[in-house]
Amino acid sequence: MKTYAIIATEKGDMKAELYADETPGTVANFVDLAGHGFYDGLTFHRVIPDFVIQGGCPRGDGTGGPGYTIKCETSAPRQRHDRGVLSMAHAGRDTGGSQFFICMNRENTRHLDGVHTCFGQVVEGLDVIDDIRRGDRILSIRIVRE
């Protein structure tokens, strides 16, 4: 059984397979936050074309988090920042919490490999990332197991 996140946004829905077996701490944290509605209504506060869309900051400016930090899991398999990969944002090793980004372009994100934890991959609705603009809202993130 696989774990997926259904990320509903103002621009459409994305379905991402989460790497629960490979990055268990990061996925457990994301699933817990999503399950408690943490992400509901938050914005994509950082959008850089051909690089990333980033959300998950309760302050909406990139400085907020859940009030705790989690460890990086960068030695796991599938740690390539390809287009559509979900990765944990942080301000330095082991400082991630709730902010995550989705990669738009492998060429411009390869330098993040081994630095940020890749914890999922968009498998449906990948075109939505191209439509997201700064300030667009995450309506909800729902976790499903199939």
Language model regions located:
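Cyclophilin-like peptidyl-prolyl cis-trans isomerases
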Residues: M1-E146
